[in-house]
Structure formats: C-alpha cells, structure tokens
C-alpha cells in the first residue's frame, strides 16, 4: 500500500475491482482518509468562484476582448481533483470533483476578472456577435493539489495568456504572452480547502495579469 494511503487511490480500485467488488468499498473508506479529511465515500462537487461585476461602467474605449479558447493540460483536464504524491506521481480523486471540466468551469471567472480589469468595454466568448478588437488564448499547464510534502499541502495553479490583435475580428500578430504561477498553502486537509486555495490562486494571478490587458 502507498505511504500516501491511496490518496485518491484510483489505481488500487481498478486493480482489485474484478476480484472483490466489496473489498474495494472497504479499501476506499480507509484509503481516501489519508490525504483529505472528510466522510468516506462522500462525493463532493466544486466550482471556481466568479467575481462580482464591478458596478462602474466599463471604459468606452471600443476595446472588445474575446476569449478565443481555454485549454487545460491533459493530466488535469478531467473533473476529478488531481493530487501530486511523488516527484512524477499523481493520483485522481473521484470523490472530489469540479462540477464541470475545468476549462468550462474557468470560462466565467476568467471573463469576469478580465472585465473587472477596467481595460475593456466588453469581454466576450468565441462565437459572440460582438466583433472583437483583441483575442486571448488561455492555457492552464498546472492545476493540482500538492501533497508531496504531507506537512505543507498546497494548491498549485499556473495560467498562461497569449494576446493577439484582431483588426478584422480574426487573429493577427501576437501582442504579448505571459505565464503566472501561484502556490497557496492549504488551511486544512480538505477538498473545500483545496478549492479555496485554487480560488485564491486565481484571484492573485488575475491581479498580476491585469497589466497585460493594458497593453
């Protein structure tokens, strides 16, 4: 058995399921308690927080930003929370999940933060009837809970932004590209604390990224 006590031990469940289905339930009850504190086998669903829209009207500068697409690195693109348990070892937790896949879950929060930056008259999604003057492609290379050091668990989030001019509503030359990384210590070893850490990481990243929007 892993020293992480099966921290979301998907591998163990798959390994024994065809031999002893009842044993899987018993194993899971103990295994899943090793990383996060929560009732055993209770499925929890979470979402990124969307910031409140600022009451002041956006600048009438004619700048319309369209989020062309959001992509999340394949290891972290599913609904299940992912935990780092070794230098090159990660495990998925089927009992702590995003409500929808992360790339969809991040759409509204990112749009809200970009709109609140005060740099754009509007921030739209791909396919909007509103013609953009700028486009942004957003990628998320890292999105996981780091439990490699069991005494210092943390929420890890990295986001990269690539802005393009769009004089005709289509991508033109690249204007800027920047990546931001945040590591937030967890206040508790719970899925809710991990989600809170990711939300704080997102807030800090968007505060840092606000100056990109001003280019």
Each model region followed by its residue ranges:
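N-terminal secretory signal peptides that target proteins for export/translocation
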Residues: 1-18
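Sec-dependent signal peptide recognition
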Residues: 19-25
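C-terminal motif of bacterial Sec signal peptides marking the signal peptidase cleavage site
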Residues: 32-34
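Surface-exposed short loop/turn segments
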Residues: 36-56, 117-170
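N-terminal segment of the mature soluble domain
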Residues: 61-132
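Short secondary-structure boundary motifs at beta->alpha junctions and helix caps
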Residues: 88-97, 168-211
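Sec-exported extracytoplasmic/periplasmic mature domains
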Residues: 111, 115-119, 145, 210-214
């Amino acid at each position: 058995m892993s020293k992480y006590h099966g921290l979301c031990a998907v591998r163990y469940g798959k390994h024994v399921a065809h031999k002893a289905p009842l044993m899987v339930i018993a194993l899971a009850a103990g295994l899943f308690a090793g990383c996060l504190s929560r009732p055993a086998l209770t499925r929890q669903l979470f979402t990124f927080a969307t910031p409140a829209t600022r009451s002041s009207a956006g600048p009438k500068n004619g700048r319309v930003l369209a989020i062309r697409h959001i992509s999340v690195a394949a290891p972290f693109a599913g609904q299940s929370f992912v935990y780092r348990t070794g230098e090159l070892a990660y495990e998925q937790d089927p009992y702590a999940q995003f409500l929808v896949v992360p790339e969809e879950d991040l759409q509204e929060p990112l749009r809200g933060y970009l709109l609140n930056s005060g740099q754009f008259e509007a921030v739209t999604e791909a396919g909007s009837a509103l013609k953009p003057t700028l486009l942004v492609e957003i990628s998320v290379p890292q999105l996981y809970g780091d439990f490699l050091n069991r005494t210092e668990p943390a929420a890890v989030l990295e986001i990269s932004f690539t802005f393009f001019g769009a004089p005709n509503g289509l991508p033109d030359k690249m204007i800027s590209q920047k990546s931001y990384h945040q590591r937030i210590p967890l206040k508790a070893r719970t899925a809710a604390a991990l989600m809170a850490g990711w939300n704080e990481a997102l807030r800090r990243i968007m505060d840092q990224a606000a100056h990109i929007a001003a280019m």
